[in-house]
Design a protein with these regions (language model features):
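TRAFAC-class small GTPase G-domain
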Residues: 1-192, 196-199
Length: 199
């Protein structure tokens, strides 16, 4: 019986957690390209997302004992159009972390971050899970419409970490995603969470 119990524990240990994170932001800010850059996929033929869809990736995170463990992450891509609001709200309810994306060349996408935070509040307590802001398209510095200072002031207001990213060059992408994933993993350890799946 002891041997059987040991085998069962080993099987459980080999199973992986599946965490869920969600991209939010206006249409054409680069949410889909950021996710594909994170997956190391080709950026050709990118189209606007017209429904919530996800990619499944694997990454290593640090456990409390300092050792690495591999987990799976569902990275949900949400549409930025108003008509898909219900889909977005449903996705928020089933996520453990959110990355808010704006385009540094489009001031409106930055101003609308406040709107996206309010949408989160309609579905879930925003203090119950971590956020990361991605200031995207830094490869287009000559067209920059939102300064680093403006973006940092907004992030500081909510105490959200902010990363400057480019899906084209890959700058900041891995760091931003890895920060959010590690934070989500840390915040869910020891919790009973119905949104965490064991595979």
């Amino acid at each position: 019986m002891g041997e059987c119990s040991s085998k069962q524990k080993n099987r459980v240990a080999k199973k992986q957690q599946i965490l869920s994170i969600l991209a939010m932001g206006n249409s054409i800010v680069g949410k889909t390209t950021l996710i594909q850059a994170f997956e190391k996929k080709s950026l050709e033929d990118i189209k606007s997302t017209v429904c919530t869809q996800f990619s499944l990736v694997k990454r290593k995170v640090k456990q409390s004992n300092g050792e690495d463990v591999e987990i799976k992450i569902k990275v949900w891509d949400s549409p930025g159009q108003e008509r898909f609001e219900t889909l977005v709200l449903n996705a928020v309810k089933n996520t453990q972390g959110i990355f808010l994306v704006f385009d540094i060349t489009e001031k409106e996408s930055f101003d609308d971050l406040q709107k996206w935070i309010k949408k989160v509040e309609e579905a879930k307590d925003p203090k119950s899970f971590p956020f990361v802001i991605m200031a995207n398209k830094i490869d287009l510095q000559s067209k920059r419409a939102v300064s680093k200072e403006q973006a940092k002031a907004f992030a500081d207001k909510y105490n959200f970490p902010i990363f400057e990213t480019s899906a084209i060059t890959g700058a900041g992408v891995e760091e931003a995603f890895q920060h959010l994933i590690q934070t989500v993993y840390d915040s869910n350890q020891g919790k009973s969470n119905n949104n965490i799946i064991i595979d």
